[in-house]
A protein has these predicted regions:
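Conserved active-site and SAM-binding loop architecture
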Residues: 1-239
Length: 239
């Protein structure tokens, strides 16, 4: 339909997990048990499709910082409690997300990957900044601040010896995550964003940098989803 929602559901039974990531951030933090008043209308479309399609398995993801009332509505509608998984178990990125699924999921531990492990060796000069840096302290995850914005998050410069904070769907305006390398500050490249989301190198190549940053920041961490889908093999073996 014209509003982006489905007018009717498929009549077949899907053999693969039905996946959905409803709008995050502000939309995800406001919730209602009524589709008519919910800001995140897509979630209730997801529920409708689940009931009509009746897939064997399903998976839904949203931000861990969402309001408890919204989380409870989702859990009530889906009949399962969410599992908290941080992407730091599989990548150099801290990214806590809630996953609702009827697939059994094993506990995962934080891995040893750090931001330094995903950095490119040779980076174009266009990614570097010349803004002054303050509060340089190489013992901290946020090891400096770059004086270019009034937004505290955009000022943060990350230490490559630590994990990177959560990637977000930014397009430009110096909002990209920044790293301190050899005494200089630069934004992370799109390829480094891909690696933090465990995508293949240059997976998003072919579109503008801004579009790449936005798409990658909006996406899932691939290895987290692969970890969840391992549970499908457990189900198959039991059956």
């Amino acid at each position: 339909s014209s509003d982006g929602t489905a007018s009717s559901a498929p009549t077949y039974s899907s053999p693969t997990p039905y996946r959905h990531a409803p709008p995050s951030a502000s939309k995800a933090r406001s919730c209602s048990s009524s589709p008519a008043t919910a800001k995140s209308k897509l979630f209730f479309e997801y529920v409708r499709l689940l009931r009509e399609v009746k897939p064997k398995h399903f998976l839904l993801e949203n931000v861990a910082s969402m309001k408890k009332e919204c989380k409870d509505v989702i859990s009530s509608q889906l009949g399962v409690e969410p599992i908290l998984i941080n992407s730091n178990c599989f990548s150099a990125q801290d990214r806590s997300r809630l996953y609702w699924s009827n697939i059994p999921v094993e506990h995962a531990k934080e891995c040893d990957l750090r931001l330094a492990d995903v950095l490119e060796s040779h980076v174009d000069e266009k990614y570097f900044y010349n803004y002054p840096l303050k509060d340089i302290d190489l013992s901290k995850q946020v090891c400096a601040t770059m004086e270019h914005s009034n937004n505290e998050m955009h000022k943060r410069v990350f230490n490559p010896k630590f994990k990177c904070h959560t990637l977000t769907a930014v397009c430009g305006g110096n909002q990209q995550k920044k790293v301190y390398v050899d005494g200089r500050c630069r934004k992370l490249t799109p390829l480094e964003y891909e690696r933090l989301q465990t995508l293949p190198d240059n997976y998003t190549k072919g579109i503008s940098d801004g579009a790449r940053y936005k798409a990658i920041g909006n996406g899932w961490t691939v290895d987290v989803i692969a970890h969840i889908f391992k549970g499908l093999g457990v189900i198959k073996n039991v059956a």
